[in-house]
Amino acid sequence: MPARLDRLWQMWSPNKALGMTGVRAAYAIAPADAQEAVGALLRLGSSWPVGAHGVAMLSTWAEPAVQAWVRDSLATLREWKAAQLALCARMGWQTLPSVANYHLAQPMAADFAGLLAGLRAEGIKLRDCASFGLPGQVRMGVLPPASQAALHAAWQRLAGAN
């Protein structure tokens, strides 16, 4: 297997690991013997320009202090995710397994669009997954306890109104 790994390309986009979900920048690590393919890609040009914010993110990504912060934040992120999944269960929302710092949830609501609109009016923004082929589900980023409490409070107000 290790010999096969030498032929793989790696694509890295550290934006989500750094909590910078709106920043669009990535880099690729090519296999050692891929000079011809790398040249062909360079001749194609980038699919979109990387702004100064993306360059800054990629420039700092490999710094020891940044890597230490990412490593040290994993335990906190796991705790927040477990709490958020438990909250979804208490609200009666079904969730799908995920190893990422976001997950999918299906709120049990007769009026899904109305629920999303009501939550948005309360300041809670959930990504409707219909465009992913998953109608009735939302993508939820793992957020801190205060944000989870805000979701729960908004859900209770909306559920009480119906």
Enumerate the language-model features and the residues they cover:
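Short acidic/glycine-enriched loop/turn segments that link adjacent beta-strands
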Residues: 22, 99, 133-136
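Generic non-transmembrane alpha-helical segments
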Residues: 60, 83, 87-91, 114-124, ...
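Conserved PLP-binding catalytic core of the aspartate aminotransferase-like
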Residues: 77-78, 88-122, 138
